[in-house]
């Protein structure tokens, strides 16, 4: 059963000018033999002349066995099964789109393959039938192979009725919904940035407070921003969101507002860490750091109290 496999899309071969994801299997005199990952690993070839626009000095710098590459289809012979590919004709924009499509299609494939495992399918034909009755229905409906199924499955997390039109029995539907929810339910991410804000003028403390308050005002209902002091002049900014890209953008905007406000008062603004998604490990480390600083501050306060008491005793 581990051998179950199927192509990602309804058509068995890519079309000319399609940009596809391949894995390099071997390198020969004529070019590189590759497997088309979205088409059940059928073989294709990248001719040496199609590897680079420049003169090739070292083929290993351009392509390596085991590496995934984005390539464009330049010829397909469906009868003989020949597929000629080009790496040099793929633009950076096309490469990004290919990566996005492959990632989403692979997610759909993983969901359906796991459904097949749970339902104890034993043949590739059963998996292909599942694709025909689910993913390919949406790909065809929305005329967007790869994207149609992914978007429909994502929508099914909040509205499972989108699957009602599919030809599925009760078990298949239940297992499919469970797997869609497991893989596609949005996960909240925490985004963090570290900044330094200081102002050494007459009203420096008020200027810092005002600048930080302006940053906090960039919060939205779904994306509240928090600012905590690590140790003057360093602060940590955080927000939690389901939308990673939007979260990074909102935190960047808040930083820009703080910078503008503090510099109006001739203060100083430095970025210690650009906005990034943080892990539990990062959070644990920050908590430890802040705890240590609190202890140090408490010790300093204790020393001050002792000195004050000694001074009173002397008086």
From Swiss-Prot:
<dbReference type="InterPro" id="IPR024054">
    <property type="entry name" value="TIF2_asu_middle_sf"/>
</dbReference>
<dbReference type="InterPro" id="IPR003029">
    <property type="entry name" value="S1_domain"/>
</dbReference>
<dbReference type="GO" id="GO:0034976">
    <property type="term" value="P:response to endoplasmic reticulum stress"/>
</dbReference>
<feature type="modified residue" description="Phosphothreonine">
    <location>
        <position position="279"/>
    </location>
</feature>
<dbReference type="GO" id="GO:0005850">
    <property type="term" value="C:eukaryotic translation initiation factor 2 complex"/>
</dbReference>
<dbReference type="GO" id="GO:0034198">
    <property type="term" value="P:cellular response to amino acid starvation"/>
</dbReference>
<dbReference type="InterPro" id="IPR012340">
    <property type="entry name" value="NA-bd_OB-fold"/>
</dbReference>
<dbReference type="GO" id="GO:0036499">
    <property type="term" value="P:PERK-mediated unfolded protein response"/>
</dbReference>
<feature type="domain" description="S1 motif">
    <location>
        <begin position="17"/>
        <end position="88"/>
    </location>
</feature>
<dbReference type="Pfam" id="PF07541">
    <property type="entry name" value="EIF_2_alpha"/>
</dbReference>
<comment type="similarity">
    <text>Belongs to the eIF-2-alpha family.</text>
</comment>
<keyword id="KW-0963">Cytoplasm</keyword>
<dbReference type="GO" id="GO:0033290">
    <property type="term" value="C:eukaryotic 48S preinitiation complex"/>
</dbReference>
<dbReference type="InterPro" id="IPR011488">
    <property type="entry name" value="TIF_2_asu"/>
</dbReference>
<dbReference type="GO" id="GO:0140468">
    <property type="term" value="P:HRI-mediated signaling"/>
</dbReference>
<feature type="modified residue" description="N6-acetyllysine">
    <location>
        <position position="141"/>
    </location>
</feature>
<dbReference type="GO" id="GO:0034644">
    <property type="term" value="P:cellular response to UV"/>
</dbReference>
<dbReference type="GO" id="GO:0005737">
    <property type="term" value="C:cytoplasm"/>
</dbReference>
<protein>
    <recommendedName>
        <fullName>Eukaryotic translation initiation factor 2 subunit 1</fullName>
    </recommendedName>
</protein>
<comment type="subunit">
    <text>Eukaryotic translation initiation factor 2 eIF2 is a heterotrimeric complex composed of an alpha (EIF2S1), a beta (EIF2S2) and a gamma (EIF2S3) chain. eIF2 is member of the 43S pre-initiation complex (43S PIC). eIF2 forms a complex with at least CELF1/CUGBP1, CALR, CALR3, EIF2S1, EIF2S2, HSP90B1 and HSPA5. Interaction with METAP2 protects EIF2S1 from inhibitory phosphorylation. Interacts with ABCF1. Associates with ribosomes. Interacts with DDX3X in an RNA-independent manner.</text>
</comment>
<dbReference type="GO" id="GO:0010494">
    <property type="term" value="C:cytoplasmic stress granule"/>
</dbReference>
<dbReference type="Pfam" id="PF00575">
    <property type="entry name" value="S1"/>
</dbReference>
<dbReference type="GO" id="GO:0043022">
    <property type="term" value="F:ribosome binding"/>
</dbReference>
<feature type="region of interest" description="Disordered">
    <location>
        <begin position="293"/>
        <end position="315"/>
    </location>
</feature>
<keyword id="KW-0648">Protein biosynthesis</keyword>
<keyword id="KW-0810">Translation regulation</keyword>
<dbReference type="InterPro" id="IPR024055">
    <property type="entry name" value="TIF2_asu_C"/>
</dbReference>
<feature type="modified residue" description="Phosphothreonine">
    <location>
        <position position="281"/>
    </location>
</feature>
<dbReference type="GO" id="GO:0032057">
    <property type="term" value="P:negative regulation of translational initiation in response to stress"/>
</dbReference>
<feature type="compositionally biased region" description="Acidic residues">
    <location>
        <begin position="299"/>
        <end position="308"/>
    </location>
</feature>
<dbReference type="GO" id="GO:0000423">
    <property type="term" value="P:mitophagy"/>
</dbReference>
<keyword id="KW-0396">Initiation factor</keyword>
<dbReference type="GO" id="GO:0005829">
    <property type="term" value="C:cytosol"/>
</dbReference>
<dbReference type="InterPro" id="IPR044126">
    <property type="entry name" value="S1_IF2_alpha"/>
</dbReference>
<feature type="modified residue" description="Phosphoserine; by HRI">
    <location>
        <position position="49"/>
    </location>
</feature>
<dbReference type="GO" id="GO:0003743">
    <property type="term" value="F:translation initiation factor activity"/>
</dbReference>
<dbReference type="GO" id="GO:0003723">
    <property type="term" value="F:RNA binding"/>
</dbReference>
<keyword id="KW-0694">RNA-binding</keyword>
<keyword id="KW-0496">Mitochondrion</keyword>
<keyword id="KW-0007">Acetylation</keyword>
<keyword id="KW-0597">Phosphoprotein</keyword>
<feature type="modified residue" description="Phosphoserine">
    <location>
        <position position="52"/>
    </location>
</feature>
């Amino acid at each position: 059963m581990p051998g179950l496999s199927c192509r990602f899309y309804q058509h068995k071969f890519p079309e000319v000018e399609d940009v596809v994801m391949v894995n390099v299997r071997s390198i020969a005199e004529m070019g590189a033999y590759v497997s088309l990952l979205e088409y059940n690993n059928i073989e294709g070839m990248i001719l040496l002349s199609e590897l680079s626009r420049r003169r090739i000095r070292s083929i290993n710098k351009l392509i390596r066995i085991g590496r995934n590459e984005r390539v464009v289809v330049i010829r397909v012979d469906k009868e003989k099964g020949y597929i000629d590919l080009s790496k040099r004709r793929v633009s950076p924009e096309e490469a990004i789109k290919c990566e996005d499509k492959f990632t989403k299609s692979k997610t759909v494939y993983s969901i359906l393959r796991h459904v097949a495992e749970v339902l104890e399918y034993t043949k590739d034909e059963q998996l292909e039938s599942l694709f025909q009755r689910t993913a390919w229905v949406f790909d065809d409906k929305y005329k967007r192979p790869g994207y149609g199924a992914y978007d429909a499955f994502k929508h099914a997390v909040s509205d499972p009725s989108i699957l009602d039109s599919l030809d599925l029995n009760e078990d298949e539907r239940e297992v499919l919904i469970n797997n869609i929810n497991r893989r596609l339910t949005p996960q909240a991410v925490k985004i963090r940035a570290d900044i330094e804000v200081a102002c050494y003028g007459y009203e420096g403390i008020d200027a810092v407070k005002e600048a930080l308050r302006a940053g906090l005002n960039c919060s939205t209902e779904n994306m509240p921003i928090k600012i905590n002091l690590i140790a003057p002049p360093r602060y940590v900014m955080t927000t939690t969101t389901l939308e990673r890209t939007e979260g990074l953008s909102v935190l960047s905007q808040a930083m820009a507002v703080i910078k503008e406000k503090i510099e109006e008062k001739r203060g100083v603004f430095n970025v210690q860490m650009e906005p990034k998604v943080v892990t539990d490990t990062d959070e644990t480390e920050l908590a430890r750091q802040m705890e240590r600083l609190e202890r140090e501050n408490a010790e300093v306060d204790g020393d001050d109290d002792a000195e004050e008491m000694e001074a009173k005793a002397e008086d």
